[in-house]
A protein has these predicted regions:
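Conserved phosphate-binding/catalytic loops in two-lobed NTP-binding clefts
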Residues: 77-112
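RNase H-like, metal-dependent nuclease domains and their acidic two-metal-ion catalytic environment used
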Residues: 1-83, 114, 118, 122-199
Length: 199
């Protein structure tokens, strides 16, 4: 869940991903540059409930923290993904009730973005994430490397893509592996070996 201020600039956006098996499948998207943060939290909550009580990972940089807080404290949404400090490893997904050391979402730091971009790249290149939305495809086509990071080219958006970057990061977390019994990175490595063997 990527959150914007609702002032007509960046988009508040999210994708719903079916994670029951690989390849993962983008089954729904939302993108709006006019929705207010309070309304967006409610919309995310209603959508997650409709999609089988979906797990929700909110980017909590800046105004996104309000969406995470609302999902956690006002709606008491049980499938909100929490993160905690993992020492030198940065952040990790965790379960359980919120505490003083747990956040209702993830801050997009350099390590989170780097891991997320790498995982997303592998998922897309190996056809292990089916992207069904035209806006997402358009954003991916203008999401390029600049210096030591990836971002939208000037005049373009990357709000849906950043949600997928966070999904990529999440697939590499132990909690995600335990949740759906899929080790994404291992599966991607196996697929790479198969492709090399076929060549």
């Amino acid at each position: 869940v990527d959150v914007a201020r609702g002032k007509g600039l960046d988009y508040s956006a999210f994708s719903v991903i079916n994670i029951t098996s690989m390849p993962y499948d983008q089954v729904c998207t939302f993108r709006s540059n006019g929705i207010l943060v309070a309304d967006y939290a409610d919309f995310v909550y209603q959508t997650a409930r409709l999609y089988n009580q979906a797990y929700v990972l909110v980017e909590i940089n800046d105004i996104g923290e309000q969406v995470g807080w609302t999902l956690q404290n006002e709606f008491e949404y049980e499938n909100l993904m929490l993160t905690e400090s993992a020492g030198m490893k940065g952040k990790r997904l965790t379960s359980g009730f919120a505490g003083s050391n747990k956040d209702p979402g993830i801050r997009t730091t350099k390590p989170v973005k780097s891991t997320g971009c790498s995982m997303l790249k592998m998922l897309v290149e190996q056809n292990q994430l089916v992207i069904n939305d035209a806006n997402t495809i358009t954003e991916l086509s203008t999401f390029s490397k600049k210096n030591n990071t990836y971002e939208a080219e000037p005049g373009c958006n990357d709000d849906l893509v950043m949600g997928l970057v966070l999904f990529g990061w999440m697939t590499n977390q132990q909690y995600f592996k335990d949740l759906n019994d899929i080790n994404t990175l291992t599966k991607l490595r196996e697929k790479t070996k198969e492709e090399v063997a076929e060549d």
